[in-house]
Amino acid sequence: MSDAEGQGFVHLRVRSAYSLLEGAIKADQIGKLAAEAKMPAAGLADRANLFGALEYSSYAKDAGVQPIIGCAIPVVGIGGGPTERWARAPTLMLLAQNERGYLNLSELSSIAYLDSAELPEPVVPWAKVAEHSEGLILLSGGTDGPVDALFAAGKTAEASAALAEMHRVFGDRFYVELQRHGLPRQAAAEPGLVNWAYDHDVPLVATNDVYFAKPGFYDAHDALLCISDGAFVGQDERRRVTPEHWFKPAEEMRKLFADLPEACDNTLDIARRCAFMVHKRDPILPSFPTGDGRNEAEELEHQAREGLKMRLEGLTLSAPEEEYWKRLDFELGIIKKMGFPGYFLIVSDFIKWGKAHGIPVGPGRGSGAGSLVAWVLTITDLDPLRFGLLFERFLNPERVSMPDFDVDFCQERREEVISYVQEKYGRDRVAQIITFGSLQARAVLRDVGRVMQLPLGLVDRLCKMVPNNPAAPVTLAQAIDLEPRLKQAKKEDANVSACLDVALQLEGLFRNASTHAAGLVIGDRPLTQLTPLYKDPRSDLPATQFNMKWVESAGLVKFDFLGLKTLTVLDRAVKHLKKRGFEIDLGKLPFDDAKTYELLASGQTVGVFQLESQGMRDTLRKMRCGSIEEITALISLYRPGPMDNIDTFVDCKFGRKPVDTLHPSLEAVLKETYGVIVYQEQVMQIAQILAGYSLGEADLLRRAMGKKKKEEMDLQKIRFVSGAKEKNVPEEQSGSIFELVAKFAGYGFNKSHAAAYAFISYQTAWLKANTPVEFFAASMSLDLSNTDKLAVFHQDARRFGITVRAPDVNRSGADFEVENGEVLYALGAIRNVGLEAMKHLVAVRAEGGPFRDVFDFVERIDPRQVNKRAIENLARAGAFDSIHKNRAQIVASADVLIAHAQSCHADRQGGQGGLFGSDPGAGRPRLSKTENWNQVDLLDEELSAVGFYLTGHPLEDMVGMLRRRRTVMLAEAMAQAEAGAEAFRMCGVVRRRQERASQSGEKFAFVSLSDPTGEYEVLYPPESLRKCRDVLEPGKAVAIKVRAKARDGEVRFFGDDAEPIEKAVENVVAGLRVHLSPSAAEIDALKRRLEPAQAQKGGEVTFVAAIGGGREIELRLPGRYTLDAALRGALKTAPGVALLEDV
């Protein structure tokens, strides 16, 4: 190092943004700060973690600065603990001298997380620090360490003992640390530290605990700590640092420690001693165990050739067989040359294990579906020759990069495959990958507004001014430039200005750590030798401390184990069919099923993989897919950008426009997509056919076109035109084709991925078209807790003529089941009952037979699992109807029933079963004397338990009255709107109302309603909402006036008016005929039910009773009655009432 003694200084304690919500300097900025300050080195010092070690090393090296890799390790078992209530475990500063030291530091950081899962924070016992001390320099910890507080408290003996122990373990690699941030406790501790150091000939070292880069960042950093701790900036008792905790220049540090210049000199000495940096590595894979003495390349070739023989057996070939063998030899040659046989074998192995154990595996994902070797190894299930898929899109010999298979597994059994991989390669060699959430524009604005205690309404308005576009996030600075109201608020309100200024400084800093949804790494050695490890409390697996980018730089190879819900749906549907005696292999379905394509053309694709959004369903109606290739094209086209070409595709398909294949030689490439360039593979093939590119070169061209770098594009155009000229294509024509292809290449889709997902789309569509009952049961089981989605499926099932039966404790399963061509509603889908509790219920029933009555039920279940709330909601949902009709009585008696259940359970636990001898009724409590709910109340209670109307609808008895007011139901409105009708009177019960602000600030609303034929949504613009808001309350029955707009099979409703349903029918009904069954109660009892409904205006009521011989007798009651839903419900549930009829 060139710095002269007495002048230089090196910061050894820099907290990066990886000290989450504490450090405010990004890892790539530390080296730049040091270089600007003319410091030869800088030390990373994040608390407990090494998240940024490799990243910092790389960027510091680029800045010409020596990275020092350190970590502030929280320790227990030495010195004193925290003295302030918000303080955490004390830390010791450890710095890596060499590779051995770095590996030990990695081990200690890993221990902090992996061994502290049950503790409030990561900590390391001092004994572990001592065990892993080789190659590490120890600083005594400063203000946050285990010694300073003891000296400050006058506990000199304890402090001295702790320092002596550190010195014993680390010897000449131990430094006593001094800090001067102006804190009283530092001044109180310093004499003891200096005296001990001089007495024991241990060097002093000066450090500044750096949290932020410049003095002006202090206020923003203070807010950051408040975000971390859930505190407020204006709060007195809270954690804070001082304005001195910044990256001070060397001269300031020298001035601060002018009385102890050696303490600054020793920062340079330590920097010299720490001549190690974390290096990037080439990819490292575990060795794959092979058979018969073969190496990995030979094993791959052996498995691939045997696999192709098996694939070709019984296959309808899409090309001559020699083409398959030729392609196999080509791919194997590239895989061997690039050194990836082991990768293919590892992936194939865990997929084969999954399939052998009955775990559903997807047919492929991403560009890997273009590999024939992947197909013959059963990594994928798509014949790439059949679908025209390219290997070079996956693995390009012209551009060396790791292959990357993304594998979809059944989401319920994915963990089993991961466990297999752990057992095969070693639990210490398999880990997930960490990810970091950051403070993005809206979130940081909301957080800063909260800690600065701005009014919640104001903060909410500010946040809504920031555009929300997850696909292309807008920064806060961009939002202020783009949104005049935000700029105006900043100008007019000092508090808003201060909030925005702080938020702008904090935006982009890391907020939290989590784990990658699917990525795993597998090492050839214990992973702590390659990366430190982290433990997410929500996962059983450890995770790497380096994120996706840097874990690959560390040499680890990522394997993606994704959980795909649709695979679980498919598996469950197949199992339902197997119970009926139908064995089906979805992987062998023919691609020419007429019912499937009829379903797709109808757009009735709720629940069909990739094809269920409203926009996609509209496009299906236009496109009328007739092949798997067209489904593949649709999946590729239905995205921003390519979507503009859907109309051209459809018009060319149906002959409304001519197909333009650009050049005769390209007809085979573009014929499948009617002249529209849809796929990246088409771009590659055009370059190959027209301009003589190899497919490897064509993949590089595709990438260049996607990046749109002008210099590179200019060179590629010269190459393209030149190559085309050699094939006798005029320069003008080839140049225009190049420009057209370049335009499409920017948003061309990966055909391999689209084809693989089209395969799953076809399978789900086939099931829905051919076995809809099993499809709905399986689909609904995978959305047990999503009542909105269950309501959609229920409505869709009705369209398919499928009955969804109410839950029943004696018939239903915990999941949705199939019985006699109907779907049985799942007990586990009832709100607030608990899936595990319902599995217990089903197990009890399976062991002891059906429940005889509600007492038998509570006497057999475990009340610790099926609690009072579960009993109440089972009753509300009608699950006890088969053994106890009175739902209201069970709800009213829930306390009694659960107490009886607890008593019986205690008896069983005490070995006193059968206490009441042969009389099962003995000792049973009395149920509350409660009448059952009327029909309206019953449906409302059912709604509360199920989330939607399942067995009936509050308005179904009013349909006749409503029709007299020319009110139509949803099903009729849809049909009439598609036929051209535009204005309707409709009705419904309001499910929810979501209000939003327009650009002008006025409120409009999306109102969800349900009528007896289904659920629908109406958009109420501001002027309509203003006059109808009070009527459109959730739970209210309303009659509405709407305008309808129909396009491509989709109907949208726009609200003009709304009124209570009672008002809509008050002058409509002439009367009501009440048909009585032979078992009818006394007429007087029915009259009493009518008394509350007597009114000046209303309809007449007539009782009708059969008297034999096909004759009836009528009794018209005097007076008039309000014939609303409440009265109808009361009559409908009265004993002996058979039918209500409007007249």
From Swiss-Prot:
**What InterPro entries does the record tag this protein with?**
DNA_pol3_alpha_NTPase_dom, DNA_pol3_alpha_thumb_dom, DNA_pol3_finger, DnaE2/DnaE/PolC, DNAPol_HHH, NA-bd_OB_tRNA, PHP_dom, Pol/His_phosphatase_N
**Cellular location of this protein?**
Cytoplasm
Q: Which UniProt keywords apply?
A: Cytoplasm, DNA replication, DNA-directed DNA polymerase, Nucleotidyltransferase, Transferase
- CDD domains named among the record's database cross-references: DnaE_OBF, PHP_PolIIIA_DnaE1
Keyword flag Cytoplasm: yes
Key word NAD present in the record?
Answer: no
Q: Which Pfam families match?
A: DNA_pol3_alpha, DNA_pol3_finger, HHH_6, PHP, tRNA_anti-codon
The record's Gene Ontology biological-process terms are:
DNA replication
The protein's Enzyme Commission number: 2.7.7.7
| Reaction catalysis annotation | DNA(n) + a 2'-deoxyribonucleoside 5'-triphosphate = DNA(n+1) + diphosphate
Example GO molecular function term?
DNA-directed DNA polymerase activity
Q: Which Gene3D superfamilies match?
A: 1.10.150.870, Bacterial DNA polymerase III alpha subunit, thumb domain, Metal-dependent hydrolases
A GO cellular-component term linked to this record: cytoplasm
Per the record, the similarity remark reads: Belongs to the DNA polymerase type-C family. DnaE subfamily.
Note the subunit structure.
DNA polymerase III contains a core (composed of alpha, epsilon and theta chains) that associates with a tau subunit. This core dimerizes to form the PolIII' complex. PolIII' associates with the gamma complex (composed of gamma, delta, delta', psi and chi chains) and with the beta chain to form the complete DNA polymerase III complex.
Q: What does this protein do?
A: DNA polymerase III is a complex, multichain enzyme responsible for most of the replicative synthesis in bacteria. This DNA polymerase also exhibits 3' to 5' exonuclease activity. The alpha chain is the DNA polymerase.
- What name does the UniProt record give this protein? DNA polymerase III subunit alpha
Write down the species. Answer: Caulobacter vibrioides (strain NA1000 / CB15N) (Caulobacter crescentus)
Q: What gene codes for this chain? A: dnaE1
